[in-house]
Amino acid sequence: MMDSSILQTLAVLYVLYLLGLIIYRLYFSPLAKFPGPKLAACSKWYEFYYDVILRGQFTFQIQRMHQKYGPIVRINPFELHIQDSTFWDELYTKNKEYERYAWMSGRFGANTTTSSTVKSDLHATRRAPLNPMFSKRSITEFEPIVHEKVGLLSKRLAEYAKNGEVLEMNSAFNAFAGDVISSYCFGFSFDQLKSSGFKDNFHAAYEAVRKFAHFGLQFPVVFIILGLSPRAMLKLVVPNIYKMFVLQKDLQSKISAIIQDHQGNPEDIDSKSSLNTHSHPTIFDELLRSKLPPSEKTVRRLGSEAQQMIGAGVETVAWALTTTVFYLLSDHACLDKLRAELKAAIPDPANLPSSTALEKLPYLSACVKEGIRLSTGVSVRLPRVSPHKPIVYGGWVIPPIVPVSMTTLDVLRDPEVFTSPNNFIPERWLGSPKVANTGESLAKYFVPFGKGPRMCIGINLAYVEMHLTLAMLFRRFTFELYETDVSDVEIKHDFMVPQPKLSTKGVRAKVTGLVVE
């Protein structure tokens, strides 16, 4: 047994180490000169408290820090945060060599996906074969499949109109977006739109992982432990996280099948996987035909890519649709304007025009942009690291390697940019919208998809889904909100994407009938 005096000595040394670390971080660190709470400067336990104990509250605590300390604050021992909408382009658009913050890239237990890649050159390599697949032209070629899914959603809503059941909007939109992105990734659909109550979707699994991500950020070893844990135990203890492991295994199996198909037809550039039931090229068929090195085409990496792509392609689109529908159903004046425009543009409600035609409808497009603005996209901060040069903000010189972050929510709800920023006002996007105080284009501050080389690659697909779905909903059906109010869409928690109050039952409505001609 270890001598008690040795234990005491070790305890004293540990305490002295902690004291020395605190003194260094407060007074001698390169970040010591930057304003912010002393507790935050001392330890990451400050962030742990707000995000893990209080459940997704650090984003809002950072906002309170800015109210007290100004536009630049030190939010933990190693990182700075800036709240100044005019600096967004400087941090995310103008400097292509800026990297992601490695510590935050591993918060889901892997950093091999394109979006989580730290180094800018490797990110560019991984993104290059994806860019053509998400171009406007490629998404237009894929659009018939989106029309097909919109039509299936319409049929399901007609069933709800007939039987009078209450519709939970986010579940329906998760199923819709899940079927769309799985069709584009693999060439087949999971058929979530056909499930009872739209309950067979990815939402529960991704939500569980997102809510766990704050803990995983502070203790990344937990993902290793989960990965090594018996699946039967996970199913019993954390059933929704277990669902993610099931999905992960399923995706890797599908990727493996696609790889085998391509290895069997190495010379056929037009070959597609046996999983692909559609005529269009799929994302993973194209990735395997790309010039990426073999190390980038492994089952494990492409499986992680698929997992991330589905999450990004489902959660944000579904929430944007849910938010937009809620505000339209809550504001009869806006809804009446939209219906009038849709009736004039779509004489036959059973025959939707192309998304290109719909995007030319000014009020529909304004509703889409305003709904996306209020839904925010991602709510978590987005750190960047300048590997070689200092970042200059105002009179502050930030040393290289120091992570600097901003938050889309701060820009999209900035009262200096958006009048009445918390209100749904589609009219703000009509004509040539300007910032009232400066005359700048309002579009400059529309950042839910990010900007620059790391902006959301799925922006074109999201716009097609939004325009087609909203046009179908409000040209064909009438709705009535059911036991739902603004608290069911107000952002109260940051779990990577916005989360309303934890007690919410979702945005619910009854499909009351068809639009009267």
Curated annotation (Swiss-Prot):
Protein known as: Cytochrome P450 monooxygenase sdnE
Organism: Sordaria araneosa
Main localization, broad class: membrane
GO BP terms: antibiotic biosynthetic process
Keyword match Iron: yes
Name of the gene this protein is made from: sdnE
Residues annotated as transmembrane: 4-24, 219-239
Top-rank taxon: Eukaryota
GO cellular component, one term: membrane
GO molecular function terms listed in the Swiss-Prot or TrEMBL record: heme binding; iron ion binding; monooxygenase activity; oxidoreductase activity, acting on paired donors, with incorporation or reduction of molecular oxygen
Pfam families: p450 (PF00067)
Role this protein plays: Cytochrome P450 monooxygenase; part of the gene cluster that mediates the biosynthesis of sordarin and hypoxysordarin, glycoside antibiotics with a unique tetracyclic diterpene aglycone structure. First, the geranylgeranyl diphosphate synthase sdnC constructs GGDP from farnesyl diphosphate and isopentenyl diphosphate. The diterpene cyclase sdnA then catalyzes the cyclization of GGDP to afford cycloaraneosene.
Pathway of action: Antibiotic biosynthesis
